[in-house]
Every structure is written in structure tokens, then in C-alpha cells.
């Protein structure tokens, strides 16, 4: 059965000064899938995510759950759309658990309910042991995992309408936590029928966890397909200028990008 489209962008363009960052992008995202936005530095991945999330305001055509973006009140949309940015400028001496609980601000919950939900997602993202630590004293990776728990908390009460956007969520993480973060994101998509959109640089991580790959180059979509179709030596050479061969993981079966020589 075809999955319903929950987010659609049509003819999306973005320009900063004289630089055309995005050029007439048409893209749609469905419930229950993980979509990786990929491409070299400056391809437009994060800019596209910011447009789609509403972080960059635009008069262009974006729809959430079949309803025009401009028709949504921000408070209502925040119950259904959560964005994990590349970095946070939070500098106040909050405790780690208080940062996660900030995700519940859009929700009408008691303090006890907020605590229970926050603890659930802190366990999933492996930050329970940091609960009473001061946020500014944490490492970059620990902060990244805390904010992931915060965004999951934000979406806990959103019913069957969930869009989770992650902008380079593994950039500060060690190997084990990279995989745990993407495993949690995929589980969130499948178990809660959520749409998950994630900006990544690692093609092999994307191949393992994403259902679809949207590869951008110079502000345009080069390919929008499953990993098996998106990852070819020709596409990788054209987009990244890198000579690669495509293998296959011996047990999990997903495509593996390897040096051609």
C-alpha cells in the first residue's frame, strides 16, 4: 500500500546575495520512511531542511499533512514537527534533564508526565547518567544526544502526524552513538509511522538506515531513489568527484561505497 505524503515542497528556490543555493526543488516525503539528504559541502542540504522546517521563512509552496504551511499556527505545528539543528546556542546553566524537558513546552502535560516522557527518551538516547549534569559542561556529542531526546519528547503527544528532521545528528558522535541515533530514528519512523528526514555526509551510514536517498549537487536534486539505485559509481563521481566501487555488506546486504583503487 502506498504511504501517504505528509510533507511536500514544490518549486523551492533559495538565494543568498548572488548565490543560488537551491534551484526549483520538487520533493515529497511520506509517513513511515527515513529519507537521507546527501551531497557535498555547499550542495544545499541544510538549506533545504531549513526551508522545509520553516526555520527559513518562505512564500513558496510547502504543505504539511496536506495543509499549506502558511495555514498552520506555529504552536500547533510544533506538536507535529520537530527539528534537531546542527548546533544549539544554549548557554544557560540548565541541568541536562531540564534541557530535555524543554521539548514538552508545546504539550499540555503535568510535570510528572513531562518527567516520565523525558526519562524515556533520555534512556533511548543514552543520556540518563547525565541527568543532573550542567548542560554547558557537557561534550559536543553529549549535547547532541540531549537535544535528540528533547526533540523526541516534543513529538511524543503528536498522534499519527509526526515529522522528525535531523540536521547532521551524528557529526559529534562516536561510532556506537552514531549507529544508536540512526537506529532510534529508523525505529521511530517504523513504529510511530513518522516521517524522518536526516542530513548526513556518510554514504554508508545513509545506505544502512535510509529508505530513500535525496542527493543534491549545486542546489539541485541529482537523484531521489532507494540506496541501491542512488549509489552508483557514476553518480558518486559526478556529485563528489570521487572514484568509487559499490560492494554489498556481507550480512546486512546494504550497498557499501568503497574506493575504486
Curated annotation (Swiss-Prot):
Recorded topology in the membrane: Peripheral membrane protein
Record-listed E.C. numbers: 7.6.2.-
ABC transporter domain span: 7-243
Gene Ontology cellular component list: plasma membrane
MF-aspect GO terms: ATP binding; ATP hydrolysis activity
Pfam families referenced in this protein's UniProt entry, alphabetically: ABC_tran
Cellular compartments annotated: Cell inner membrane
Oligomeric form and interacting partners: The complex is composed of two ATP-binding proteins (HmuV), two transmembrane proteins (HmuU) and a solute-binding protein (HmuT).
Protein name listed in UniProt: Hemin import ATP-binding protein HmuV
Amino acid at each position: 500500500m502506498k504511504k501517504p505524503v505528509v510533507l511536500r515542497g514544490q518549486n523551492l528556490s533559495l538565494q543568498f546575495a548572488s548565490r543560488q543555493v537551491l534551484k526549483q526543488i520538487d520533493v515529497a516525503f511520506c509517513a513511515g520512511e527515513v529519507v537521507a539528504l546527501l551531497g557535498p559541502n555547499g550542495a544545499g542540504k541544510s538549506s533545504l531542511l531549513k526551508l522545509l522546517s520553516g526555520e527559513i521563512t518562505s512564500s513558496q509552496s510547502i504543505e504539511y499533512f496536506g495543509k499549506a504551511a502558511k495555514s498552520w499556527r506555529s504552536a500547533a505545528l510544533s506538536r507535529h514537527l520537530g527539528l534537531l539543528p546542527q548546533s544549539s546556542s544554549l548557554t544557560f546553566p540548565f541541568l541536562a534533564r531540564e534541557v530535555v524537558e524543554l521539548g514538552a513546552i508545546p504539550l499540555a502535560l503535568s510535570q510528572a508526565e513531562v518527567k516520565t516522557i523525558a526519562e524515556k527518551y533520555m534512556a533511548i538516547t543514552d543520556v540518563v547518567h547525565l541527568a543532573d549534569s550542567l548542560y554547558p559542561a557537557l561534550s559536543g556529542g553529549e549535547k547532541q544526544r540531549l537535544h535528540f531526546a528533547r526533540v523526541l519528547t516534543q513529538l511524543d503527544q503528536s498522534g499519527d502526524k509526526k515529522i522528525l528532521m535531523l540536521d547532521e545528528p551524528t557529526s559529534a558522535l562516536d561510532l556506537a552513538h552514531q549507529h544508536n541515533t540512526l537506529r532510534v530514528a529508523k525505529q521511530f519512523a517504523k513504529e510511530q509511522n513518522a516521517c524522518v528526514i536526516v542530513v548526513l555526509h556518510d554514504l554508508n551510514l545513509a545506505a544502512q538506515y535510509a529508505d530513500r536517498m535525496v542527493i543534491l549537487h549545486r542546489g539541485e536534486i541529482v537523484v531521489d531513489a532507494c540506496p541501491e539505485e542512488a549509489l552508483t559509481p557514476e553518480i558518486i563521481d559526478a556529485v563528489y568527484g570521487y572514484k568509487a566501487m559499490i560492494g554489498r555488506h556481507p550480512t546486512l546486504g546494504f550497498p557499501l561505497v568503497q574506493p575504486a583503487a
